[in-house]
Design a protein with these regions (language model features):
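Bulky hydrophobic segments
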Residues: 1-145, 150, 164-181
């Protein structure tokens, strides 16, 4: 059995981020601090989403519960591949689950096209963005107390779509205003 704490995952994500940004700086032989500041929005999205997705909101003895990897309990995988079947099942917190899964990813839809020039259309942003929840759902598979659900991917991608729609809508309005002026 192996336990991953939020603090451990936070340190891992942070060190990986710093190493990646340092390698990019060395490769490019310069650091664009304005761009690095923009990229912090992506980093914040990663850290916050990792906290919400991998670590339950309930506290155990006053601390964030650990993520437990137990090889003997991996199978059977907890996975739902049939969309919408369980989405509207009424249980405590079902509405919060739906709203939370959408709103949690709106910042991704805003941050990614803001930071990455190649994500210059709504379609590209949503298509690339959909890979992020797919990655998250896949990485939850080995953890017996987590489940992977196609509905989460659909809801998360909807959040990315909403965020990108806001981003490109504001950008369009700004461009129109500049043309009129």
């Amino acid at each position: 059995m192996f336990e991953i704490t939020y603090k451990g995952l936070f340190i891992f994500i942070t060190l990986a981020w710093i190493a990646t940004r340092a390698i990019c700086g060395i490769k490019n032989k310069k650091v664009d601090w304005k761009y690095e500041a923009k990229l912090l929005t992506v980093y914040i999205c990663l850290v916050v989403i990792a906290r919400i997705v991998y670590f339950p909101m309930r506290l155990v003895e006053g601390h964030i519960a650990s993520l437990v990897l137990d090889i003997e309990k991996i199978f059977p995988l907890w996975i739902n591949l049939i969309p919408i079947v369980h989405l509207f099942d009424v249980y405590d917190g079902w509405l919060i689950n739906i709203i939370g899964n959408v709103t949690m990813f709106i910042p991704v839809g805003l941050a990614w096209p803001f930071c990455f020039k190649k994500l210059d259309t709504l379609g590209k942003t949503v298509l690339v963005g959909a890979g992020f929840p797919l990655f998250i759902e896949t990485t939850q598979l080995p953890f017996y107390d987590r489940c992977s659900d196609i509905d989460d991917i659909i809801l998360n991608t909807t959040g990315i779509f909403i965020g990108a729609l806001i981003y490109f809508g504001v950008k369009l309005l700004k461009n129109r205003k500049n043309r009129i002026s």
